[in-house]
Each structure stands twice: as structure tokens, then as C-alpha cells.
Amino acid sequence: MTASIVAHLKLARDDFTLDVNLHLPGRGISALFGHSGSGKTSCLRCLAGLERAASAYIEVNGEVWEDSTRGYFQAPHLRPVGYVFQEASLFPHLSVRGNLTFGWRRVAPAERKVSLDQACQLLGIGHLLDRRPATLSGGEAQRVGIARALLSSPRLLLMDEPLAALDSPRKREILPFLERLHDELDIPLIYVSHAQDEVARLADHLVLLEQGRAIASGPIGETLARLDLSLAQGDDAGVVFEGRVVGHDPHYGLLDLRLPGSSGPLLRITHAAQVMGSTLRVKVQARDVSLALAADSASSILNRLPVRVRESCPAANPAHVLVSLDAGGNALLARITRFSADQLGLHTGQILFAQIKSVALLG
């Protein structure tokens, strides 16, 4: 059976109703994304059992945690969940080591998924073990909080805007550690955020919430490229790719990335040498993609890809058009002027060349 997380939740309050049907991958990072008040935290609290929905069915990789039709509700302390809040909320009277081992000692040795040494290595906190929480920076405290959640040996890790209370330098400090959790641990993670840059960098699967409803859910690359969603209308609209390193030009400092799919195109980016076959995540902004009827070999633009027009729609700025493109099975977005669209004779199914002016490496 395919690993998956299923949650059907209905929760009514005086001023808010949550009504979602979630089907998420049972591994990797799934992001719940939306504005404040859209229902992101309510979803997490229901999954953890901290909020009891009027109607609920929750199943995590084959194990039922809640089924209101049968009157079954697994108590919060019995759910194998690690919960990371905006604030680390460490025990102030214990050292970092004491905070980490508090829950870990209560897990049977045979059930432990992560060792103390492994958690310290993953989060880079080995040098903090003898410190008290009051002496930690915000970023250090949050890393300790994440390690503490891991050491409870959860089957599901929930993170509720773990970077929201941190300034930009501390956010940049923690993001690489979250990427390591994704790469090195086989624990599914549901990540709540309203920051699109965090989601683009971390998530494999994206759920867009609006007013208590899940209006979109799918792989992050495809979901970011949907023209019917508000995500495509923002100034930072774009798509995310995970490319495999297939070449390196040390003279010019260029990497060749092969995008997914049997006919996945090649992207060239400026970057130091990487291990051949390794995977890198990149983002291409819609504003950095122009379209042409033919490949221009005289251009200084490195990346010129043959593409097929999927669809187009008006952009938020009435002078522009958003264009959804297929690049060898990969979704790509372009934002061009209406004048340019008319000059190209833009239509569905048309074969064009996408000229990508900039590719941003995430991480």
C-alpha cells in the first residue's frame, strides 16, 4: 500500500469553519500554505488531537488515529506526533541536554527512530548541550526544539510556522537544517507557513488553504504553475524544479542540471562544482522568462528551451499576460506583455522558445 496521510476534518466555530479533505504523501514535506486565518494551524491541531473536530477521519500511513463515525479518538499523548511551534518553549530549568532527553528517555529503546547523537548532528547543536535555554539565540533555541521533537520518535512531524518569530539571518541559519531533515530522515513532515520562499525551498507537496477550505493540493512544481490560483499572480510567481547534476564546466563555473522526465530539458546555472548525480532545487520566476518564435543563438541568455503553450490568462497587471508552458513534461510560467502575446500570435499548443534570464538556486 502506498504510504499516505488522509485527513477529513470539519470544525465549526462562531466565526470560522474548517472543512478540508487532505490526501498527502506519506513521506517528504507537505506544506500548508495560506494567509493568516485560512485554517493552517487548525489543521495541525486536529492532526495532533489538540482540537477535536465535529467530524474527522485521520489515517497516517495505514494507522487510524481518529474516526468520528465510529466514535474513535486517539488521545493526543498517544499519537506519535512531534510538534514544533513558533516558539521553542524549552524547559527553562533544564539544560539543552535535559530538554532533549526529557521525552527521549520515555521512548522504548526499540521504538527510537533517532539517537541523541544523530539529532545533535542533524541540527548542529552538539556544542550547546550544557547551555541553558536563556543563553540561546532564537535560532539555536528553535533548533533545539526541533531536535526535541525528533527525539520523541514521531511517525509524523508537525511544524507550525517554526521560522515566523525569527529575523532573516536566523531563518537563513535554520533552513539548511530543515533541508537535512528532509534528505536524511524518513519521517513525513507537515509544514505550515505563509512565506512562499520557505515553501518553495522545502516542500515536495503543496496545499493552498483559503477560508478553511483546501482549494488546491498537488506536487509543488505543478501547483505553483496553476494559472487559476492566486500564487501565479504575485510578483514572485514562478515554478520550482529539482534537477540532477549531469555536468560541470570549471572554466566558466557552470553546472548542467537535467530536469525530471524522459525528455527533461537541460538548465545551465552558475555554481561551484557539485557531486555528479546529486540533486539541486532551483526556482524560475515568471518575470524572468521571455518567449520567442525561434531560438536566438546570438543571445547572451544561457537557457533557451523549446516549450509548448498550455494556456494563458490575464495577469493582475492588465498590461501583462501569464502563460503556462510545458518544457519537456515540466511546468514553466512566463509573464509577458499583452503586446508581445499578440506579436507572437500566442495560442494553446503553440511551440515557442522560452528564454530564461535567471535561475535561482534554492539552498
Curated annotation (Swiss-Prot):
Primary location recorded for the protein, binned into one broad class: membrane
Residues reported to bind ATP: G34, H35, S36, G37, S38, G39, K40, T41
Domain called Mop: residue spans: 298-363
Keyword entries, A-Z: ATP-binding, Cell inner membrane, Cell membrane, Membrane, Molybdenum, Nucleotide-binding, Translocase, Transport
Cross-referenced Pfam families: ABC_tran, TOBE
Topology of this chain in the membrane: Peripheral membrane protein
ABC transporter domain location: 1-236
PROSITE patterns in UniProt: ABC_TRANSPORTER_1, ABC_TRANSPORTER_2, MODC, MOP
UniProt key word Transport: yes
EC number: 7.3.2.5
InterPro entries in the record: AAA+_ATPase, ABC_transporter-like_ATP-bd, ABC_transporter-like_CS, Mo/tungstate-bd_C_term_dom, ModC_ABC_ATP-bd, Molybdenum_import_ModC, Mop_domain, P-loop_NTPase
A molecular function (GO) term: ATP hydrolysis activity
UniProt function note: Part of the ABC transporter complex ModABC involved in molybdenum import. Responsible for energy coupling to the transport system.
PANTHER family cross-referenced by the UniProt entry: ABC TRANSPORTER I FAMILY MEMBER 10, MOLYBDENUM IMPORT ATP-BINDING PROTEIN MODC 2
Record's subunit section: The complex is composed of two ATP-binding proteins (ModC), two transmembrane proteins (ModB) and a solute-binding protein (ModA).
Similarity-based family: Belongs to the ABC transporter superfamily. Molybdate importer (TC 3.A.1.8) family.
Protein name (Swiss-Prot/TrEMBL): Molybdenum import ATP-binding protein ModC
Gene name tied to this protein: modC
